[in-house]
Amino acid sequence: MGQALFTPSFNLKTGKGQVLVVPYTATDATHCTLETKAIEDVSAFKAVKDGKLTITIDGNEHKLSGLNFETIKTLADVVKILVAENLDIDIEATSENKIKFTSRRLGANDSTILMEATTGGAGTDLYGANYLDGATATTTNATNATGTTLAELVAKAEDFGYFGGILTTQECENTLVKANATAIQAQDHIYYEVTKSLKNMAVLGEQITQANLNKTRLLAYSEKNEKVAIATYATIASSTNYSGTDTCLTMNLKELTGVDPDKNLNQTYYNSAKTNGCDIYGSTCGLSAVYSFGANSYTDEVTADLALKKSLEVAMFNVLKQTMTKIPQTESGVTALKNAAIQVLQQFVRNGAIGTGLKWGSPIPFGNGETFQDNIEKLGYYVYSEPIANQAQSEREARVCPLIQIALKRSGSIHSSDVIVYINR
């Protein structure tokens, strides 16, 4: 996972970032597994061309039918036919000649597997003793993560200095991920997490999106080494050098260097990712790419917003700190602070986060309407404060600057295009 942070050519070092490693004591959540008895002879399977199986995975019942094993030669071939059903579960043949089913979800409440006899209908039930022998299968229940939580760790790590992105090697169940996301949302951090279950996009992804927890970026990736996938995703997302020109990027269609595309994706999962605000990593015509969706905001928007906030904080603090005398509580003093903000905004126009030539698409929230629209279109931003002469006496006594309000227009990013061609003979 650590090596993945530096594998892509564009990584956190490109964005002038560093890695802070903070150890903590915790256990991983585990997956539920179901393992058959040893199957030494697959000849019984070879006679099956109409196999059926009822299996409930993470609370979702699946009734498989029409399974044809006539061409199989090994136990691995049996597994291939089961895998081809594209269930949201990992299936493998073990070294002990057993078939092992592993839920892709985590934790006692979310990760479950139940195999049972199929009632009614034609076909050969693979639950039977001559096949999977479901009655003797061994189930190992999933467990929840324990120990220090990510929220507790972040509070401790902040003593070392500021950090933006957060990754954890800990495997977390949905409830813990949601708790982490809720805690991080109130802070100046971005939490990168991955779910191995594609169906979990409609559960965990929906929960995070509906709660407006957009500082949590959820990648759904069902292949092996999912933690490597999210680390690679996170380092590319953190690679923007906001001091440059045209350096802002979108995660859409980016290649995750060293990560295989998810072969289990289909149109249903694509639609689920789009609806539930998750990103996925697939392949189109042999090209591996991230497919990024905005139901929970786009990742580049969240990273740029945080970079802008921290840049404004530093710039305006520096005005106060680097002034040898004082900033007067007059219009000229307010202008000095506004000019510092404007310099930051101009840089974010240059780096591509803020766009010009665009119109404000909602009711004007403050200031002079005509000036507001003109500034947004020409500059990409509008900076406003009420005249200091109108400031309340209590604020003057507290030596507070009048509220400085900033509106800006995102530059956005084109992710797709429609083309109509008119042909005349």
Regions found by a protein language model. Give the residues of each.
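Extended basic-aromatic, gly/pro-enriched interface segments that bind polyanionic ligands
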Residues: 210-339
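Generic serine detector
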Residues: 7-9, 25, 43, 65, ...
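Short, surface-exposed charged micro-motifs
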Residues: 88-90, 277, 405
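Structured, hydrophobic secondary-structure cores that serve as assembly/anchoring elements
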Residues: 1, 291-425
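Helix N-terminus capping/helix-initiation residues
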Residues: 131, 148-149, 261-266, 330, ...
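Acidic/histidine-rich, surface-exposed loop or edge segments in extracytoplasmic proteins
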Residues: 55-66, 317-322
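Polar low-complexity, Ser/Thr/Gly/Ala/Asp/Asn-rich disordered segments used for subunit assembly
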Residues: 1-58, 67-227, 363-365, 375-381
